[in-house]
Amino acid sequence: MSGCSRIAPFPAASTGNDLVSLEATRPERTTLPRFYSRILTAAEQEGYCPLEPYRLPFDHYVWLCWSVKEAVYKYQKRQIPELVFSPLRISIRQIVPPSGPDGFYQATVEGAPTPGPVRPPVEGAPSPANSPAAALYARSLIRDGVIVTTVCDNEAFAGTYWGFSSIDSPAYADQSAAVRTLLLGELKTVLSRDDLRLQKDPAGCPIVLAGDQPLAIPVSLAHHHRHIAYSYRLPDHAAQAQRSA
């Protein structure tokens, strides 16, 4: 996989994830209108139902939407470095409940707005490589008191991989170290190389380096309380090789 280091380090593709440890939230606060109205749009508030057949409590619904929006923000931040997180500017079109108790909640999200004025397209001009997707897709798993969400620009999640785990310590430094160790262990196996490391780009997004060379593998990290999660996006040729392995 050494050829990955020759790919341009700033691909249009991205990834975003988030994680919420429900035991570290306060349901009585989450269900106050003055709290959830800063997260849910009017349409999202009106669209809430117990999400049959599993009757998702309202506070869980709020944090599910938060998780989706945070993951969307992380996805878009890599493409639009100046983007500022604003939950009410990210609109969830719909959330489809899972077909079984261990399945995914699936959400469709309108493309996050770009900062500043939007210029009309010039006829015949190509779209910029880093323009936001018209829609993003989220898959969220709610299990063992944690919400884990991953976002992709294709509904099949082709080339996007993710994982999560629990840790013993809720300390921020331990969370941060553990999730990086978890992701690097996965990538070292997938890419068959041991010279990988993580650092942040100028916008604060994590990037993968092989030695000193940035790789075209977008990654996203999340941690909360005693839980950690990651997602990453492989280039098309690498994803195909991974599926064939």
Question: How would you name each of these model-derived features?
Answer:
Residues M1-A245:
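Core catalytic alpha/beta fold that binds nucleotide/phospho-ligands
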